[in-house]
Amino acid sequence: MEITPSDVIKTLPRQEFSLVFQKVKEMEKTGAHIINLGQGNPDLPTPPHIVEALREASLNPSFHGYGPFRGYPFLKEAIAAFYKREYGVTINPETEVALFGGGKAGLYVLTQCLLNPGDIALVPNPGYPEYLSGITMARAELYEMPLYEENGYLPDFEKIDPAVLEKAKLMFLNYPNNPTGAVADAAFYAKAAAFAKEHNIHLIHDFAYGAFEFDQKPASFLEAEDAKTVGAELYSFSKTFNMAGWRMAFAVGNEKIIQAVNEFQDHVFVGMFGGLQQAASAALSGDPEHTESLKRIYKERIDFFTALCEKELGWKMEKPKGTFYVWAEIPNTFETSHQFSDYLLEHAHVVVTPGEIFGSNGKRHVRISMVSKQEDLREFVTRIQKLNLPFGSLQETSR
C-alpha cells in the first residue's frame, strides 16, 4: 500500500532551524568542537525553586490521573497575578487564559482558531519562521510587513495594500523582537490596536522575550487601549525562567479568542501534567530578582561580545535593545547569510543562524545568540579572527 501524506503536509514550509542544526550534527560527528551561538536555547539552569516545585508535585497522587482539560485554576490565577504585578493588566483567570505545551504549539493553535482558507495573515519580515507553519496549515495566505532598521524595525501599517487589508484576518507582532532585538513602546501598541480594530484584524502579540528589554521595563501589548478588543498576547516560560525544555506557554487576552483556543484544544489535548503546572505557578510567583539577574547576565554578554568583535575583527554591530540576540550584518564578500553561516561552520566550527531563515529582509544578516559563557564568546571571536574576513569593508559600503 502506498502511503500518501495529506496536501497540508506536502505544502508545509521547510523547517529551516532543523536543517541548520542537522548540519551542525553532521559536523560534530567528525569530532569537531562546535561553538553554537545559533540556537536561542538558554544555557543557564532553571531556578532551583521551580525544579523543587516539580519534584514535590510529581509525588502528589492527585496529579497522576487526568487533570482538567483547560488547566488547573491555581495556575491561571498565578498568571493573572503575574500580569497584574508586572504590567498592571487585569486578567480574568477563568475566561482570559489558555495554556499551551510551548510557544510553537500556541502559535499553531491560534492560527487554526483565527484563520479560514483564503484569509490573509500579516507577518513581519524578518520574523519568527514558525508563524508561517500555522498559516500554511490553516490554508491561509501570507503577507509580509517589512521591518527596516531606519524605522526601528517596526512595521509601517500605512503602507499595507488596502486590497490586502480587506482579506486580512490576523496579524502577528513580536517585541522585544526575534531576530532584530528591537523593542516597541506603549504608543506603538496603541497604534497597532487601533489599526487592527479599524480593519477588523485579530492581533496576536508574541511576547516570548517579554522579560528582556535593557533600557526600561518592556510594555505589554495588553496595556494598550482596545488591546483586549482585538487580540491576545502569547507568553512563554522558556526564556524568562530558563525552561525551554519544559514546553510551557500561555495566551491571555480577548475572551472570545481564548474560548476558541480552549474549544480547539479540548479536541486535541487532555490538559497538561499537574506537576508542570505547579512548577509554572512557582515560576510566576517567585522572586523577580531571578529574571533581573538573568537580564544583567545577557546584557554583560552582549556588551562583552560586541566590543570584542569590533576590537578584534572590525565587525561593528548594533547592540539589541531587547532579547539576547545580536543581529549582525555579514561581509560583502558573501552573497547570502546562508553562505556566510555555512562558511563559518566549515572553517571555524562556529554556528550562527542565517538571517534568511527569518525572511528575505534577513539576507544580509545573521542572528547570534548570547547563550554561552564569556569564554565561549571569546573563543568564537578568536576562531573567526583566524579567517581574516573583511568586516571593515562592510562598514564602509553598507552604512
UniProtKB/Swiss-Prot annotation:
<feature type="binding site">
    <location>
        <begin position="236"/>
        <end position="238"/>
    </location>
    <ligand>
        <name>pyridoxal 5'-phosphate</name>
    </ligand>
</feature>
<comment type="pathway">
    <text>Antibiotic biosynthesis; bacilysin biosynthesis.</text>
</comment>
<protein>
    <recommendedName>
        <fullName>Transaminase BacF</fullName>
        <ecNumber>2.6.1.-</ecNumber>
    </recommendedName>
</protein>
<comment type="subunit">
    <text>Homodimer.</text>
</comment>
<feature type="binding site">
    <location>
        <begin position="103"/>
        <end position="104"/>
    </location>
    <ligand>
        <name>pyridoxal 5'-phosphate</name>
    </ligand>
</feature>
<dbReference type="GO" id="GO:0005737">
    <property type="term" value="C:cytoplasm"/>
</dbReference>
<dbReference type="GO" id="GO:0017000">
    <property type="term" value="P:antibiotic biosynthetic process"/>
</dbReference>
<dbReference type="InterPro" id="IPR015424">
    <property type="entry name" value="PyrdxlP-dep_Trfase"/>
</dbReference>
<dbReference type="Pfam" id="PF00155">
    <property type="entry name" value="Aminotran_1_2"/>
</dbReference>
<feature type="binding site">
    <location>
        <position position="128"/>
    </location>
    <ligand>
        <name>pyridoxal 5'-phosphate</name>
    </ligand>
</feature>
<keyword id="KW-0032">Aminotransferase</keyword>
<feature type="binding site">
    <location>
        <position position="209"/>
    </location>
    <ligand>
        <name>pyridoxal 5'-phosphate</name>
    </ligand>
</feature>
<dbReference type="InterPro" id="IPR004839">
    <property type="entry name" value="Aminotransferase_I/II_large"/>
</dbReference>
<keyword id="KW-0963">Cytoplasm</keyword>
<keyword id="KW-0045">Antibiotic biosynthesis</keyword>
<feature type="modified residue" description="N6-(pyridoxal phosphate)lysine">
    <location>
        <position position="239"/>
    </location>
</feature>
<dbReference type="InterPro" id="IPR015422">
    <property type="entry name" value="PyrdxlP-dep_Trfase_small"/>
</dbReference>
<keyword id="KW-0663">Pyridoxal phosphate</keyword>
<keyword id="KW-0808">Transferase</keyword>
<dbReference type="InterPro" id="IPR015421">
    <property type="entry name" value="PyrdxlP-dep_Trfase_major"/>
</dbReference>
<feature type="binding site">
    <location>
        <position position="178"/>
    </location>
    <ligand>
        <name>pyridoxal 5'-phosphate</name>
    </ligand>
</feature>
<comment type="similarity">
    <text>Belongs to the class-I pyridoxal-phosphate-dependent aminotransferase family.</text>
</comment>
<dbReference type="InterPro" id="IPR004838">
    <property type="entry name" value="NHTrfase_class1_PyrdxlP-BS"/>
</dbReference>
<dbReference type="GO" id="GO:0008483">
    <property type="term" value="F:transaminase activity"/>
</dbReference>
<dbReference type="InterPro" id="IPR050881">
    <property type="entry name" value="LL-DAP_aminotransferase"/>
</dbReference>
<dbReference type="GO" id="GO:0030170">
    <property type="term" value="F:pyridoxal phosphate binding"/>
</dbReference>
<comment type="function">
    <text>Part of the bacABCDEF operon responsible for the biosynthesis of the nonribosomally synthesized dipeptide antibiotic bacilysin, composed of L-alanine and L-anticapsin. Bacilysin is an irreversible inactivator of the glutaminase domain of glucosamine synthetase. Catalyzes the reductive amination of the C2 ketone of tetrahydro-hydroxyphenylpyruvate (H4HPP), with L-Phe as an amino donor, to yield tetrahydrotyrosine (H4Tyr) diastereomer. D-Phe is not an effective amino donor. BacF associated to BacG converts 3E,7R- and 3Z,7R-ex-H2HPP to 2S,4R,7R- and 2S,4S,7R-H4Tyr, respectively.</text>
</comment>
<feature type="binding site">
    <location>
        <position position="247"/>
    </location>
    <ligand>
        <name>pyridoxal 5'-phosphate</name>
    </ligand>
</feature>
